[in-house]
């Protein structure tokens, strides 16, 4: 609920291991809000979000360890270099086993910019960093809000290849403005107009 207005209601989702889905809606359709609720970054005014792993509920303060989230509005630390960002993330959310900093930088195709501050990156380069930090993180749930925002055609191909390589068996949900390239992996569709 936002002020006195319900942004969505009667949403009931059961996202099991390996769920692949997309939340579809135009601008202002609250896709981002629903993704934030699923991630537990936002608390719903009514209802609950339950997380379990191996049939045991995950405590609220530990859920962040199991979710990786990418969105164009998520801030990066402007004064950090790419290498510093990767090192910082590893302290609270490790990457998929076997991935070194050098390998992540190589997959990002930003090696010649690795010592440059993020504040000097273009919007497309920043989005690549956000995507790599989320997709290559060791998590059970991957949330992607408008993942191809700010990417040029080459960047969109890179996104698809990276996700195909590192999707694994985890659950993945994208929020999209009906752009097929963002949710090529989806087997399930949620249209927000059904819940408003």
Regions picked out by a protein language model, each given a short descriptive name:
Residues 8-10:
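Conserved structural motif at the start of ABC-family nucleotide-binding domains
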Residues 39:
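Helix-to-loop junction immediately C-terminal to a conserved catalytic motif
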Residues 47-63:
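Conserved ABC transporter NBD signature motif
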Residues 73, 78-94:
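Q-loop/switch helix immediately C-terminal to the Walker
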Residues 98-114:
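Conserved ABC ATPase "signature" region
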Residues 131:
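Hydrophobic anchor residue at the start of the ABC signature
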Residues 142-146:
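Catalytic Walker B motif of ABC-type/P-loop ATPase nucleotide-binding domains
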């Amino acid at each position: 609920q936002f002020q006195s207005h319900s942004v969505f209601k009667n949403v009931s989702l059961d996202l099991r291991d390996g769920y692949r889905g997309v939340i579809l809606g135009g601008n202002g359709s609250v896709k981002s809000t629903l993704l934030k609720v699923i991630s537990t970054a936002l608390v719903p005014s009514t209802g609950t979000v339950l997380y379990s792993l191996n049939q045991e509920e995950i405590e609220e303060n530990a859920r962040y360890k199991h979710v990786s989230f990418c969105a164009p509005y998520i801030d990066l630390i402007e004064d950090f270099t790419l290498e510093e960002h990767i090192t910082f993330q590893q302290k609270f959310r490790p990457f998929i086993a076997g991935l070194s900093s050098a390998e992540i930088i190589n997959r990002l195709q930003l090696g010649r910019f690795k010592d440059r501050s993020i504040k000097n990156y273009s919007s497309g380069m920043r989005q690549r960093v956000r995507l790599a930090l989320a997709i290559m993180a060791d998590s059970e749930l991957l949330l992607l809000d408008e993942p191809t925002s700010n990417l040029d055609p080459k960047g969109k191909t890179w996104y698809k290849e990276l996700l195909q390589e590192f999707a694994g068996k985890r659950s993945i949900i994208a929020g999209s403005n009906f752009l097929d390239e963002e949710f090529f992996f989806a087997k399930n569709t949620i249209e927000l107009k059904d819940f408003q």
